[in-house]
């Protein structure tokens, strides 16, 4: 079944058949000549030619703009003062080391260290005069925030199980801190007694 379907399909011509048809089929017409070596080299030279050369050729073919008269250029140069140009040149040129210095690296590092020292010596007067005012103010603000926090059970609400566990953890941490402070201040003989007194009591559920 499959072979019967493929039989009426015309096959594509091969390369040999195409060349034979071109050579023998066209009567009285010569086949096109193959490109010679000179044509090949000429095409390569055209492809390898840079675009800048083409741009120059197109620019030369365009009509040139009318040039400004020389007296306008002279007026413009006279308008610019020589002092301004000297200032611009002096600002652009960096300061060179003195001829007495042996190593230019020593001069360069000495200059950078001097600039850093000048920057440190100048106080930052944009804010307050005391640099410790900002941390103190932040500490006061955090203290106020801590004082503003009120436990929920003091407002008449029943503490939930999560709040109870958090309160228990905070209470144990406070007790341990107090115990450590008392241990550091007490005598070695009373260390065990203070530890037993301040240890938290765990109730069985």
Swiss-Prot record:
InterPro entries: DEPP
GO cellular component: mitochondrion; peroxisome
Keywords in alphabetical order: Autophagy, Cytoplasm, Mitochondrion, Peroxisome
Inducers of expression: Up-regulated by hypoxia.
Top-level taxon: Eukaryota
Compositional bias segments (type: Basic and acidic residues): 138-155
Residue ranges of the region described as Disordered: 55-171
GO-annotated biological processes: autophagy; regulation of autophagy
Protein location: Cytoplasm; Peroxisome; Mitochondrion
Positions with biased composition (Polar residues): 55-64, 83-101
Principal location: cytoplasm
Coiled coil spans: none
UniProt function note: Acts as a critical modulator of FOXO3-induced autophagy via increased cellular ROS.
Annotated protein name in UniProt: Protein DEPP1
Organism: Mus musculus (Mouse)
């Amino acid at each position: 079944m499959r072979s019967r379907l493929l039989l009426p399909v015309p096959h594509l011509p091969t390369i040999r058949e195409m060349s034979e048809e071109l050579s023998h089929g066209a009567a009285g017409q010569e086949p096109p000549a193959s490109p010679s070596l000179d044509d090949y080299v000429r095409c390569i030279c055209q492809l390898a030619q840079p675009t800048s050369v083409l741009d120059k050729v197109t620019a030369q073919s365009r009509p040139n703009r009318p040039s400004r008269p020389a007296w306008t250029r002279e007026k413009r140069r006279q308008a610019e003062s020589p002092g301004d140009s000297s200032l611009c040149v002096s600002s652009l040129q960096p300061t060179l080391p003195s001829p007495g210095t042996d190593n230019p690296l020593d001069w360069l590092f000495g200059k950078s260290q001097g600039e850093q020292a000048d920057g440190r010596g100048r106080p930052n007067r944009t804010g307050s005069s005391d640099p410790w005012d900002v941390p103190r103010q932040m500490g006061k603000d955090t203290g106020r925030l801590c004082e503003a926090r009120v436990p929920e059970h003091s407002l008449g609400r029943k503490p939930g199980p999560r709040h109870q566990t958090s309160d228990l953890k905070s209470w144990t941490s406070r007790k341990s801190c107090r115990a450590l402070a008392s241990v550091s201040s007490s005598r070695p003989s009373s260390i065990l007694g203070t530890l037993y007194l301040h240890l938290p009591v765990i109730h069985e559920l």
